Amino acid sequence: MRWNDDAVVPAKVSPDLEFLFRQGERLILEAVAAREEEYILDVGCGRAVDAALLSESGAVVIGLEPSEVMLSRAKEHLGAVSAPVALSRGVGESLPFRSNSFDKVICKGALDHFLSPDKTMAEISRVLKPGGEAIIAIANMESLAFHIGRGTFKLRAIFSPKADRGAKPWELPPDHTCKFDYRSISTLVKSYFQVKKAEGISLLYGMPGWGNILSLLPRPVRCGILALLDKAARPFPSLADVIVVKCALFSWRK
């Protein structure tokens, strides 16, 4: 597999997307709350940016990635920041690790790329130690912004048939195998885990014209607006741009 992330970040990054990336990284690392000597697995680690940051806690971190290209980029990044992260090639549906091996497993922005998210969740459950935690972060394809976007473009199509027909943020990217919203990710997770907390990150990313409006505002003003929207998104994951679910193994599992 030679998938790469070249198309993930657009050539021009809007203020709302920049904020989403930055805030997402910070809050997900907080959710993991890595501790010294914990064993942590990052499934679909990409460039291993999060894995490198997690290793700063003293945790033993392993990054799993199916793509040869991304593994190469991960090695470059880890070398550049001198992070002691081990890398392994493999897929989420068949994790190459023994059962009860990890204290925590993180899967950020990768579950919707897998052929079988259900098998992946089963495997994450298998490799976690009793009392272990899984932290799942996924793009919400039914966010408030995407609902507004779909409605806006339907109206545009009625009154302006020649309206822009390019790719839209609320359309499923070609490298995704499925789409998630709050209901579907909750249903999937609850098949294998007890949900400890579900939160939203960011609000209104991808709403038509929103990035352009923010670009016109002074930086302190737009940062304040984005921070307020992010705070508003936290208790409403069904409306947020990204959903983060922190969960634990069922207490009866030995």
What are these regions (language model features)?
Residues R183, T187, K197-K254:
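A C-terminal cap/extension of S-adenosyl-L-methionine-dependent methyltransferases
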Residues M1-R35, E37-G46, V49-L53, M70-R73, I135-K162:
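Conserved class I S-adenosyl-L-methionine
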Residues D118-P130:
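A short glycine-rich, Lys/Arg-flanked "PGG" loop and its adjoining helix->strand segment in the class I
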Residues A167-S184:
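Acceptor-substrate binding/catalytic loop of class I
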Residues I106:
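A conserved beta-strand element that flanks and buttresses the S-adenosyl-L-methionine
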Residues R47-S94:
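Class I SAM-dependent methyltransferase SAM/SAH-binding core
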